[in-house]
Amino acid sequence: MVMGYRVGIDIGGTFTDLVYFDEYSKEFHVVKVPTTPKSPDVGAINAIETAKIEFDKINILIHATTLGTNMFLGQEHLNPPKIALITTKGFKDVIEIGRQRRPKLYDLFFEKPKPLIKRRDRYEVEERIDANGNIITPLNEEELQKIAEIIKKKDYEVVVISFLHSYKNPIHEKKAREIIKNLCSNVDVITSYEINPEYKEYERTSTTVINAYLKPLVSNYLKNFIDSLKNKGFNGKFYVMQSSGGISNIKYATERPAAFIESGPAAGAIAVAYFSKILNDNKVIGFDMGGTTAKASTIINNSPLVTNEYEVGGEVHAGRLIKGSGYPVRFPFIDLAEVSAGGGTIAWVDEGNALRVGPISAGADPGPVCYGKGNDKPTITDANLILGRLGEKLSGGLLKLRKDLAEKAISKLAEKIGESVEEIAYGIIRLANTTMAKALRIVTVERGYDPRDFVMYVFGGAGPLHGVELAEEMEISSILIPPSCGVFSALGLLLADCRVDKAKSILKDIDEVDEEEIENIFIELIEEGLKEVEGFEEIKIVKQIDVRYKGQSYELTIPWTGDLKELADNFHKKHETVYKFSSLEEDIELVNARVTIIGLLTKPEIKCYEVKEYKPKPESYRKVYFSSGWEETAIYNRDKLKPGAIFEGPAVVEEYDSTIVIPPDYTAFVDKYGCLRIER
């Protein structure tokens, strides 16, 4: 391959971040531009042009986007497709009934999420396969042909086929797809056995419907983006980041868009995992605060924790999606907790005259009040500006902040409550920190971990403004700010590997199977997965099994080492870690076999420098507000801090893509990789 550029582009709710690696100079470069919500690809092209990269010299471009998330946030300019669902007779209401959990037990006015497919667009056909894969009732092809005629007349764009127990025997779904395609050649037909071949009909149907819901939008978006790139001379490889933390080719991305809903946050977790390995930090919390939301993840032994079920379109409450308030998706997702607290999150006063922060965001347009684009509702960014934590210029001086406008907006809140402007601004920061701390507790305490045992890696455009105070609230003693922290998720795109996940239901007691039967299932899954991971010199295969005590509803995923006794022992240990108890006498059930096939990519090298300890000279000083009040604070330029620099707080470190706040009584040190480690 001719030397050129490797480019990572992360489109967030407020900014589009670009990191590129120059294969000639072996240097990383970064660019940050406003997101263009109605046409996200325009912002991405703007970022490349701002970076002055020649399109024909881009060898690899890896992309993460919020497009899937935005679809479930009801953005008006995103038009969902017209979808029909065909299912087993008697089961067309499965996606409406869902699971009988009440996410808010005492809320008499709670409304379940509306089904993505209306009842009039759901059709039933006579067929039945039992839980063992045996045909009880043959597929009624004549009935299906009548449904196909209706589909043709009503101009559906996508048809979802989800039959009972098709994960065990997909013969009826295959035949139904064939009949529909023969009679409706212009309709895209998606079957549940291809998207999610696992038991639980509601989750399988929901996953397939969400995939269908996203597919036309994502396919058109990616096609337009790639066409725009090619028109400008791009001829390199194009990959998309999945929610699992692995990248995939364009074909996989367009066929399974539901696997890409949390692609941006996943890239951030991958960057944290990479740095935790080179820095020998085995327990790490990743904290990412951008313009719209804040996310937390847990990295243990250099690998992010992954969950096999996620909810989209649900309510965000205390850092988590309330189970039952959204739509379940069964794809691997990096286990994240997310809250509505970003730089653009709006502060307001409620009917009881109490200060509130979020969940509404000013977004990329108009943005915070201090951007001067017409917004008059104060945000977290405005509060940081008033408190002196932010300077009056961002992005290397490209974005000038209007402190006078921020003060005017926050003074309105101050008048209502009867406090000073700085007290209200500091109250906004404290409320935001309280909300974000809940997310940190979810990925640690609620997963069975003590946060005091962890190092916290802080990144995102707004994360380092809040990271140290958040760590203090969680009693975390060591904080690390990586280089290019404001575009760290985009950097993570360049540090990821290609990944394909395959699964198959087992649903047998552990004493009903032997190692040979399990290995045969894995052989089948590996053969299937390898077809989708081609062209890689080095491939890694990970085998896992979902395990539970018999009678439980949810499983724990345990590595498969080839020995059933070892599997059982490891399950008991993990159950003890997660739930604080285990039961050695209980029967164990094997639910799903899972294979992850990883095509290893060559990573750009993170440069290491000689460390010579010295005390740097501040660029200037300014007053900054902390818990103790206004403090004369040293201001440093991060680009001028060399490895070995050591200095004490209070301090503010400014760089192109972010600003780092170091309160009094903390010491900061620049390590050999350019990371800023802050300790008390």
UniProtKB/Swiss-Prot annotation:
BP-aspect Gene Ontology terms: glutathione metabolic process
Top-rank taxon: Archaea
InterPro entries, per the entry: ACX-like_C (IPR049517), ATPase_NBD (IPR043129), Hydant_A_N (IPR008040), Hydantoinase_A (IPR002821), Oxoprolinase-like (IPR045079)
Protein name (record): Uncharacterized protein MJ0964
Pfam families the record matches: Hydant_A_C (PF19278), Hydant_A_N (PF05378), Hydantoinase_A (PF01968)
Gene Ontology annotations for the cellular component aspect, listed alphabetically: cytosol
Record-level Gene Ontology MF annotations: 5-oxoprolinase (ATP-hydrolyzing) activity
Recorded family membership: Belongs to the HyuA family.
